Structures are given as C-alpha cells and as structure tokens.
C-alpha cells in the first residue's frame, strides 16, 4: 500500500470505492482522516437489494461526501453469481461454475469496478483510490488479494499513462480490527447504524453489531468480528 506521509497527504485527493457496507464505510472514515479531500464512487450493477445503494447515499450525505453513482447492468447479462439472483441461497453454497469459490462471487467484479474508478479518478484529478479489500477474513475471492490489486494498479496506470495509487487499509485487518479502525476514525456508530452488509437485505432486525438476518455468511462474519472486537476492549 502507498506510504501515506503528512507532506504527501497535504495535496492528495482520494476516491473511495464505496458500497455502503462495513468495510467501505470504514474506508471512507479512514480516507477522511488521512486525505485533503475525499469523494466516493458507488456502483449500481443489479445487485440483489436496493438497500445497499440507499444506505450508501445516506452515509455519504451524513459525512458530507460527494458521491458519484454509476449505473450499469452488465453482470446480470453475463450472469454467474447468486449475489445477482434474489431466489438463490447464499448461506453456504458453492459457486455454480466455480465450486471452489462461494456462490456470492461475481467474476471480474472488482476488476471492472477498479477500472471504472480509475477512469473517474483521472477525470476528477484524484490521486488515490481507496478500496476495502481484505485477505484477513478471506472469503475465497481471488480479486481481494494483494497480488491482484498491485498488478491491476500497474496495468491501469500503464494503459492510461497515469500514476494513480491504490490504498487498501483493511488488507491485513480482520473484522474485529476493522471495527477498531472504524472507532479510531470516528465512524463506528455510523457503521453500526447505517452500513449494510447482509446478503439477504434485512434491515428489520437490529443486533449489537448492526442490522441483518444473522444467517448469511456476511452477517456471520460481521457478528463474529464484533464479538472479537468487544472481547479485545
């Protein structure tokens, strides 16, 4: 990850790839703390639940962050993920065509997201792209590995004659450590009350770790992280 020195930050402008979930909300708080100015880019790509987009808007408004929402419907046409189908079971199912991966894996999603974010950053004159990818609570997603993001950064900069840097503050942090970072950056209450992680789109059940169904893998990981975070205090 880019070395963030005070002198470099005084003229740095960050773009957060922002879904409205726990990780990207934490990254938004982290970016606000470290960079001179911050924007957010959110992708409306036909995901299962509109609540993700709604919560991202709410969080961006509460933090006073400029948010660009890009709508496209490509993944549903390529269609190879339970995350795009409201009828699919996401509890512990394998991917339909890649059984060694979770059913929620969307092939090449991060590659496309980061490519579009890179193009937007060029247009806006932004110097850094912040993403919440993590290897610590590894879900089996190959596009959440450091090897992937470092190679993509180089490829995108070579292909556009740019020098935009990627930063990924959660790469080696598990969910408990992500809760701790949210607290450090002053956004823990916002993460608990407004961020959305649940694969089933449940905002009707409130637990100490936030809203969710408490049954899907995302809720399980978030609950486990919260309990570990509380135990560390």
Swiss-Prot record:
Asked whether the keyword Cytoplasm is assigned, the reply is: no
Keywords linked to the UniProt accession: ATP-binding, Ligase, Metal-binding, Nucleotide-binding, Queuosine biosynthesis, Zinc
Which Enzyme Commission number(s) are on file for it? Answer: 6.3.4.20
Q: Which residues of this UniProt protein bind ATP? A: 18-28
> Which sites bind Zn(2+)?
198, 213, 216, 219
What chemistry does it catalyse, as a reaction equation?
Answer: 7-carboxy-7-deazaguanine + NH4(+) + ATP = 7-cyano-7-deazaguanine + ADP + phosphate + H2O + H(+)
Its required cofactor(s), as named, are:
Zn(2+)
Q: Kindly indicate whether the keyword Metal-binding belongs to this entry.
A: yes
The protein's matches in InterPro entries, at most eight in alphabetical order, are given as:
QueC, Rossmann-like_a/b/a_fold
Q: Name one GO biological process term.
A: queuosine biosynthetic process
According to its UniProt entry, the function of this protein is described as: Catalyzes the ATP-dependent conversion of 7-carboxy-7-deazaguanine (CDG) to 7-cyano-7-deazaguanine (preQ(0)).
Which family does the similarity line name? Belongs to the QueC family.
Q: What is this protein called?
A: 7-cyano-7-deazaguanine synthase
In which organism is this protein found? Wolinella succinogenes (strain ATCC 29543 / DSM 1740 / CCUG 13145 / JCM 31913 / LMG 7466 / NCTC 11488 / FDC 602W)
Q: What is the lineage of its organism?
A: Bacteria, Pseudomonadati, Campylobacterota, Epsilonproteobacteria, Campylobacterales
